[in-house]
Amino acid sequence: MAELNEFLILSSRLCNFEKVEMQFVLLMKKLLYLICTFAALFALKSHAAVPEGAIPFIFDSHLYLQATLNDTVPVTVIYDTGADFLYLDEDYLKLNNLQNAFGRKGVAKMGGAGNSEPQRVEIFVDSVEIRCGELDYWNKITPIIRLRDILGRYIDGLLGNTHLLSSPLEISFSKGYLKQWEAPFPVDSLENYHKLEARFEDNRIDVKASLQIDSANAVEGWFRLDLGSGSTVSLTNEATSSLHLDDMPKAYFRTQVGGVGGGSEDVEIRAARFCMVDTFENVVIDCSLNEKGALSSGRPYLGIIGNDIWSLYDMVLDPVSSSVWVKRNGKKGTYSQSSTTHMAVFDRTDICDGWIVNGLYKGGIAEQAGIEIGDVIIAINDRPVKEISWEEQRKGLNLKGETKYTVRKANGEVVTYTLFVQKQII
């Protein structure tokens, strides 16, 4: 998800489209969906000390915000500090008949975290207004990308730094809100916060940190602050190549879609400790094998730090003074945990009746059973996955022991696999 702005407009083949009226019934359905999705969140916020003007979010490895496009169109976006502006999901537009709702289109070339060359995508070249909380932004160019192929059905779009980080931004993972502040930020209000060594360049944020793999392997330097990543720490291919990992326990992982730009390959290992303000021990990290994209070589950072680390803090990002302030928030985190099902899936019940297998660990229980990337899981222990709500997914299914997966293969055949879910992959 990092470096989503790496695109060059190749052509200005603009087509004039008449702006379509939004059908009342369609909008009501979408509004009802959003109201139901965020109802529990807003009920909680009413009891929490959320500042006036703050933007509440649901945290599910990413920060999900409710917003509105052009005053009328509901949209759920995530905040990604590895991106610049507004991006919209292709299936969100198609399923809601919004393909031509935001004016003229052009073509762009765009890269990202995936392991492939930059790809051609459609863009809206007319400005799109987005309202997020009490904040209004006009987005000049809006790429149309396949975000749901990366994160699943509950994402409609993505919002980057150009809009949300135009002034000091408070991010409270403990209370679930963002809040923009006027500059200068009142530093005297940051009691118990720690200031990180940081740099703000090219609309991105890097911080200093160190990673000790074992007694023979360590890296120290700049890491990208990436709220668009749900992982702990992901090293670039170049940083990975500098290490001696041959004798270390490791798990090979590959995905069909690892980010904008295609699939990805990496190895997971356990690092002895990761040090920033605090020291985290026994951390599961990713070591990229990608030859292209944001985690390849030649990058001005050693890797990216994702939300498995940042969610343990409340933060203030201040682009005016190029400062990052953090305070531990009491959460224990999952940075020492790795997969027990040995596969990665995402919910695509918006377009089919199941969860699509997007990633597999080499030699893991899922691969050994016969599950393949691209398979559609339609039931777990005879329970249709369409019945499993987003809230239940966020809490975790806590699968243990003998577990039956009913799967639809690429040829349409329905097969049941039995996995014994117990051990972490690494």
Predicted regions span which residues?
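Pepsin/retropepsin-fold aspartyl endopeptidases
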Residues: 47-426
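Bacterial Sec-dependent N-terminal signal peptides
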Residues: 7-15, 21-52
